[in-house]
Amino acid sequence: MNDVIRDFFKMESAGGILLVIAAAIAMTIANSPLGETYQSLLHTYVFGMSVSHWINDGLMAVFFLLIGLEVKRELLEGALKSKETAIFPAIAAVGGMLAPALIYVAFNANDPEAISGWAIPAATDIAFALGIMALLGKRVPVSLKVFLLALAIIDDLGVVVIIALFYTGDLSSMALLVGFVMTGVLFMLNAKEVTKLTPYMIVGAILWFAVLKSGVHATLAGVVIGFAIPLKGKQGEHSPLKHMEHALHPYVAFGILPLFAFANAGISLEGVSMSGLTSMLPLGIALGLLIGKPLGIFSFSWAAVKLGVAKLPEGINFKHIFAVSVLCGIGFTMSIFISSLAFGNVSPEFDTYARLGILMGSTTAAVLGYALLHFSLPKKAQD
């Protein structure tokens, strides 16, 4: 039994599978006699914040820290290091964010409250998408994995910018000042070639608290900390950035993201009507993910190649690109996160229907994306 559990957690797809299980359990509990207990637990206050708040603002900051680390590594020595390798996934990512947002706006342009959710279908759940791709094992070319990873990382970076610019509340000048000072201290530590992680974590904790109180979403502190961690260690030392990235990954994949899914996917269907489910808000999200993502990613990718701006990565074709573009319609955790920012404190009903739209679009995209990859990839494993 222990060997079975150990082998499961070694699977590339394990994180995505756990996300699905956590979301399914949450939905089941929320619509059972335990539903009130579930909601009561999430709204229990611990050290001045609810459990839900700690998960969404606290633990998710660690997830965004991991994103910051991954983006920095890819920019300095990975798939985004050179213009030639970065331009193709970057163009694809722009299309993949623009088209879903436009579809959502087309559906909800006449609703001044619903329009604030325009960024919900622009996100891609990197863990879920990579997990689905991993189910196909070595049939997937390495270049296609790199393309999806680079695209999703750029997408995540875009989401970070969107949150900072469009989902920020009333600002506290004093808290912002402390945040800017702490940011300066972090990058001063980097400039002084401090490679011990403890000083970064202490200053980072103060930064997180300052950002939490500033009106800017606290998870953005995680990205700043990630960018400040040095890539190179002193002579004879391991890379601090890679060490932290390696250490955080299992906690994020197998702990934080499933916990986030459990806390946010538990939607009570009581009072949910078919007319509400087919209204402009959930339809705009579901179709934004299901149609907007592949439309934007594929059309921008195709245009970039045909115009000579970028080249297709070696070993993959446009059938593969289209399959991946459908897979990127899995918004799930990132889309739910943006929904909580857009509607969480404004309209619980909007938030409920938004999450149902996310689940409909993401689930369909996962099934279709897997099927398209299955039929478009070589039948035999790649070397």
UniProtKB/Swiss-Prot annotation:
Primary localization class, coarse: membrane
Membrane topology of the entry: Multi-pass membrane protein
GO biological process: regulation of pH
One GO CC annotation: plasma membrane
Functional pH dependence: Optimum pH is 8.5. Activity is null at pH 7.0 and increases as the pH increases from 7.0 to 8.5.
Gene3D superfamilies assigned to the protein according to its UniProt record, in alphabetical order: Na+/H+ antiporter like domain
Record-annotated membrane-spanning stretches: 14-34, 47-67, 87-107, 117-137, 146-166, 171-191, 205-225, 252-272, 280-300, 321-341, 356-376
Superkingdom, natural source: Bacteria
Molecular functions (GO terms): sodium:proton antiporter activity
Record keywords, A-Z: Antiport, Cell inner membrane, Cell membrane, Ion transport, Membrane, Sodium, Sodium transport, Transmembrane, Transmembrane helix, Transport
Subcellular location: Cell inner membrane
Role this protein plays: Na(+)/H(+) antiporter that extrudes sodium in exchange for external protons. Can also transport lithium and potassium.
Family: Belongs to the NhaA Na(+)/H(+) (TC 2.A.33) antiporter family.
Name of the protein in question: Na(+)/H(+) antiporter NhaA
Organism expressing this protein natively: Vibrio parahaemolyticus serotype O3:K6 (strain RIMD 2210633)
Native organism taxonomy: Bacteria, Pseudomonadati, Pseudomonadota, Gammaproteobacteria, Vibrionales
